[in-house]
UniProtKB/Swiss-Prot annotation:
Species name: Caulobacter sp. (strain K31)
Lineage of producing organism: Bacteria, Pseudomonadati, Pseudomonadota, Alphaproteobacteria, Caulobacterales
InterPro entries on file: SfsA, SfsA_C, SfsA_N
Name listed for the protein in its UniProt record: Sugar fermentation stimulation protein homolog
Family recorded in the similarity comment: Belongs to the SfsA family.
Listed GO MF terms: DNA binding
Xref: CDD domains: SfsA-like_bacterial
Length: 237
């Protein structure tokens, strides 16, 4: 997936009100950018970190700049939570995720419970439907382990129950974690920050929900899904 251009590099000054982030660009300009990430962004919003922002000339926008990447731990980390669904849509269209290849139709944002929409519904005349939920992951604190979530994620825990309900009806259901960083070699649910979600993921897997974890290759020009990572499952409690 090509990132919007032009891009500019700068240094983070502060993030505030969740969706605003001030930076000083390398050319000296002081800007306020949209931060398209409602999460805690642990270790990725600290003053002094280098970051990359894209510029839009759309006059309807209140903020012309959008935060896309942060330089952390010697590499680039994708922090735009809108991008994982775009990455997955592109990968599905190209059959670039072997476990999810071969479906005849890919439908985004399909309602599958009273108050939920699944990210993608994959269908084929000769297969059960596949309900696919996508989560962005960019938290790392221990070696090469990627963790999700980085804060309490009650809505994400509900999605796991919705996926398990589809499996009970005879469908296939997949929870896909898109890891927007290049320095991780395995994945785990973050038990201490959200034990309810960690237990929910284990219970969902025991109920037949498949868990996939894919790492990305990242540059200031492009992000693409590249490599399957193992899931280090925590025992259900």
């Amino acid at each position: 997936m090509l990132l919007p251009q032009p891009m500019a590099r700068g240094v983070i000054v502060q993030r505030y009100k969740r969706f605003f982030i001030d930076l000083v660009l390398d050319d000296g300009r002081e800007i306020t950018a949209h931060c398209p990430n409602p999460g805690a962004m642990l270790g990725l919003k600290d003053p002094g970190l280098a970051a990359w922002v894209s510029w839009s000339g759309d006059p309807r926008r209140k903020l012309a700049w959008t935060l896309q990447l942060v330089e952390a731990d010697g590499g680039l980390v994708g922090v735009n939570t809108m991008n994982p669904n775009r990455l997955v849509a592109e990968a599905l269209a190209a059959d670039a995720i072997p476990e999810l290849s071969g479906y005849a139709m890919i439908r985004p944002e399909v309602k599958y419970s009273e108050a939920s929409r699944v990210d993608f519904l994959l269908t084929h005349p000769d297969r059960p439907p596949c309900w696919l939920e996508v989560k962005n992951c960019h938290y790392r604190r221990d070696g090469t382990l990627a963790e999700f979530p980085d804060c309490v994620a009650a809505r994400s825990a509900k999605h796991l129950k919705d996926l398990a309900a589809e499996v009970a009806k005879g469908a296939r259901a997949v929870q896909l974690f898109v890891i927007q960083r290049t320095d991780c070699n395995s994945f785990a649910a973050c038990e201490d920050l959200d034990p309810v979600y960690a237990r929910g993921l284990s219970h969902a897997a025991a109920a037949g929900v498949e868990v996939l974890c894919y790492r990305c290759d990242i540059s200031p020009d492009e992000i693409r899904i590249s490599r399957n990572l193992p899931w280090r499952d925590a025992p259900a409690i």
